[in-house]
């Protein structure tokens, strides 16, 4: 670590589980002088590599920023609207604060969402107990837009889902070891 706030990428040899070659800085964060660009997630969507990450720590300046590149091993360009999501402008008394650390999810039917962390203040303070929140994502000019037309997390979110019931062999009195022993469905998991 060289003391700079950067996100790096380096090739991983999956057979030997070792890093190969030199690491390369691909992004320094969206905000000038940003602290803690962290928790990076990489996605390949429509020919671009997207790098989504948190900035500003886990307090009032917490946010989500994104950058993209056609190639993985080159400098990424930032979204012109970065940070693409934050509650920093809503004040400490807003019902949900410290929103950040997002992860994009596509439901297989073309609907996009972001799952993120945030806190609820109690009597003007935050215990920093973070909860998981979900918001809708749309795409404009190749960039994600979180909570379009709303700009903040909502109390409820309508989802296009059907009721799901776990199989009878799953019970609340079992530790479900057999479930966790199974290998992931290769149709659902990819490292490409």
Tell what function each PLM region has:
Residues 1-192:
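Carbohydrate-active catalytic/glycan-binding domains of CAZyme proteins
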């Amino acid at each position: 670590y060289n003391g700079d706030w950067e996100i790096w990428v380096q090739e991983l040899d999956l057979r030997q589980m070792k890093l190969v070659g030199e690491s390369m800085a691909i992004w320094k964060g969206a905000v000038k002088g940003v602290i803690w660009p962290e928790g990076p997630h990489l996605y390949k969507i429509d020919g671009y590599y997207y790098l989504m990450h948190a900035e500003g720590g886990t307090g009032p300046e917490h946010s989500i920023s994104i950058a993209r590149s056609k190639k993985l091993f080159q400098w990424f360009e930032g979204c012109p609207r970065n940070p693409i999501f934050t509650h920093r402008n809503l004040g400490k008394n807003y019902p949900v604060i410290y929103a950040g650390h997002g992860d994009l999810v596509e439901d297989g039917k073309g609907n996009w969402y972001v799952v993120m962390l945030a806190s609820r203040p109690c009597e003007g303070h935050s215990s920093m107990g973070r909860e998981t929140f979900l918001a809708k994502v749309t795409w404009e000019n190749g960039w994600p837009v979180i909570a379009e037309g709303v700009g903040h997390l909502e109390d409820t979110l309508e989802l296009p889902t059907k009721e799901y019931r776990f199989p009878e062999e799953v019970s609340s009195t079992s530790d479900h070891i057999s479930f966790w022993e199974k290998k992931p469905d290769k149709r659902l998991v990819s490292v490409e």
